[in-house]
């Protein structure tokens, strides 16, 4: 699946969805891309890098949605003891596009990543 969540989110934005509820399961893309000399001592531990990549992925997804006019929240929807994949991205259209392009680009440059959702939203 990998980037399936990104395609679903981009499609929801293109369709003008008023509310988006997404439980992302696909966060491998950034794990493969993430490179940063300053973070090398942390990224050398595969498990840590994988978990950080998953969190960065969903945080960037939420911020990209805010740039499209959605107010977003990232929530736990089920107790951690049941599943570690318990993040819900809730996005509600309010039309106020957050001017966060510069900040997001700085983060993506720092991590040497280009999320699929960013590319898909640029196309639309």
Annotate each PLM feature.
Residues 1-124:
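Class I S-adenosyl-L-methionine
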């Amino acid at each position: 699946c990998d980037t399936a969540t990104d395609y679903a989110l981009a499609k929801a934005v293109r369709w003008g969805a008023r509310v988006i509820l997404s439980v992302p399961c696909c966060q491998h893309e950034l794990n493969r891309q993430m490179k940063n000399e300053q973070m090398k001592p942390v990224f050398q531990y595969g498990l840590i890098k994988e978990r950080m990549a998953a969190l960065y992925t969903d945080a960037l997804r939420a911020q990209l949605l805010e740039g499209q006019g959605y107010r977003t929240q990232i929530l736990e929807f089920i107790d951690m003891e049941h599943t570690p994949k318990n993040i819900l991205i809730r996005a509600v259209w309010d039309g106020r596009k957050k001017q966060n392009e510069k900040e997001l680009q700085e983060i993506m440059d720092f991590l040497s990543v280009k999320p699929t959702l960013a590319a898909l939203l640029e196309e639309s």
